[in-house]
């Protein structure tokens, strides 16, 4: 199983890069998380939110279409399904058994396009709270690591 994280935006602060790297390196080779950073759409003074989301959505879906193997598109969205870490662990176990390579999508500051949300196999919400997107990267990779530790009966989750 290869996990792809498709994230709109680049040039993250050092603490984000360090936090992400810390948890990514803890995951075993067979999970092999891959961060794909996609450019923010141009936001001029008179930009249209829908046009920006559409441009970013095209990049996201293009990256998804180029991801390897049998895939699932999972969009992170405030209106998505809330998961407990144990449920995420169950999903990871199923992905491994079924040979699925999940693509987890973190949208830009304006959210995800309707085309992304409509094409998603699943929509998840990490929290009912609004979070800065850099923090979501660290939170997501930590939760993937935590779910993996549950599957391994590792004491990290306790």
From Swiss-Prot:
Amino-acid positions noted as binding S-adenosyl-L-methionine in the UniProt annotation, renumbered to this chain: 76, 107, 126-131
GO MF term list: rRNA (pseudouridine-N3-)-methyltransferase activity
UniProt keyword terms in alphabetical order: Cytoplasm, Methyltransferase, rRNA processing, S-adenosyl-L-methionine, Transferase
Pfam family, one: SPOUT_MTase
Catalytic activity: pseudouridine(1915) in 23S rRNA + S-adenosyl-L-methionine = N(3)-methylpseudouridine(1915) in 23S rRNA + S-adenosyl-L-homocysteine + H(+)
UniProt-listed InterPro entries: Alpha/beta_knot_MTases, RlmH-like, tRNA_m1G_MTases_N
Protein EC: 2.1.1.177
Record-linked Gene3D superfamilies: 3.40.1280.10
Principal location class: cytoplasm
Compartmental location: Cytoplasm
GO cellular component: cytoplasm
Known role: Specifically methylates the pseudouridine at position 1915 (m3Psi1915) in 23S rRNA.
Subunit comment: Homodimer.
Protein family (similarity comment): Belongs to the RNA methyltransferase RlmH family.
Name assigned to this protein: Ribosomal RNA large subunit methyltransferase H
Lineage of source species: Bacteria, Pseudomonadati, Pseudomonadota, Gammaproteobacteria, Cellvibrionales
């Amino acid at each position: 199983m290869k996990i792809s994280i498709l994230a709109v935006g680049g040039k993250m602060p050092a603490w984000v890069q360090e936090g992400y790297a810390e948890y990514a390196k803890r995951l075993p080779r067979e999970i092999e998380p891959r961060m794909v950073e996609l450019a923010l759409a141009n936001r001029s003074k008179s930009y249209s939110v829908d046009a920006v989301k559409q441009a970013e959505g095209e990049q996201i879906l293009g990256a998804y279409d180029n991801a390897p193997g049998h895939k699932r598109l999972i969009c992170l969205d405030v209106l998505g399904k809330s998961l407990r870490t144990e449920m995420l662990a169950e999903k990871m176990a199923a992905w491994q058994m079924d040979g699925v390579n999940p693509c987890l999508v973190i949208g830009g500051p304006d959210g995800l396009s309707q085309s992304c949300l409509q094409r998603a196999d699943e929509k998840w919400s990490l929290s009912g709270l609004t979070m800065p997107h850099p923090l979501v990267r660290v939170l997501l990779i930590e939760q993937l690591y935590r779910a993996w530790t549950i599957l391994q009966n590792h004491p990290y989750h306790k």
